[in-house]
Amino acid sequence: MNELYNQRILQLAAEVPHLGRLADPGAQADAVSRLCGSRVHVELCLGADGRVTDFAHELQACALGQASSSVMAREIIGSSAKDLHAVAEQMRAMLKENGPVPSLLDQPDKWKDLEVLSPVRDFHNRHASTLLTFDAVEDCLNQLGW
């Protein structure tokens, strides 16, 4: 279990940007891990082109949920809905199917910090908390028709 909570995960968990709420979110969603009780509340706004223009979130999560949320918060603004769905799908595949670290062809390094979460694949009971931010973001995108 110690390999899960390495220094980089703890650093990401301690430095989570965009905490709080938006004045006028386009969509908002909650995700909860039934196993550990971790919670994420996400709010975002999209431009007409389907790119995220603003983002905020509130967390009551373990270090893994905080670390994945930290990476999301650093990378989401300016990302397209299409890319966010792709990254979420790749993240699930990384954890559940031993897939590669999420990467976009046109921006191969953008989501590279998710690699630090690859050891979670061996701990199935930690998948849900690690994926909370992705579930909530995709819920928001779906609400907005993307």
Q: Residues of each region from the PLM?
A:
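Structured beta-strand/loop patches that form or line metal/cofactor-binding pockets in enzymes
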Residues: 19-59
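Short C-terminal domain-edge/linker segments immediately following a structured domain
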Residues: 44, 74-76, 86-88
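Secondary-structure capping and boundary motifs in well-ordered enzyme cores
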Residues: 34-36, 64, 125-126
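Alpha-helical support elements that line or immediately flank enzyme active sites
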Residues: 68-80
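Short, thiol/selenol-centered motifs that function as redox-active sites or metal-ligating centers
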Residues: 60-66
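Alpha-helical macromolecular-interaction surfaces
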Residues: 66-67, 86
